[in-house]
Curated annotation (Swiss-Prot):
Membrane topology of this protein: Single-pass membrane protein
InterPro entries, alphabetized: Cytochr_b6-f_cplx_su8_sf, Cytochrome_b6-f_cplx_su8
Subunit-level organization: The 4 large subunits of the cytochrome b6-f complex are cytochrome b6, subunit IV (17 kDa polypeptide, PetD), cytochrome f and the Rieske protein, while the 4 small subunits are PetG, PetL, PetM and PetN. The complex functions as a dimer.
Protein name as catalogued: Cytochrome b6-f complex subunit 8
SUPFAM superfamilies in UniProt: PetN subunit of the cytochrome b6f complex
Organism of provenance: Nostoc punctiforme (strain ATCC 29133 / PCC 73102)
Amino acid sequence: MEILTLGWVSLLVVFTWSIAMVVWGRNGL
C-alpha cells in the first residue's frame, strides 16, 4: 500500500514538474 502511494506521488510530482518546465519555458524564464 505504501509503495503504491509512493508511486502515485512520484507520478504526480513528475507530471507537475513537467508542466512547470513548459510554462516557465514559454514565459522565457
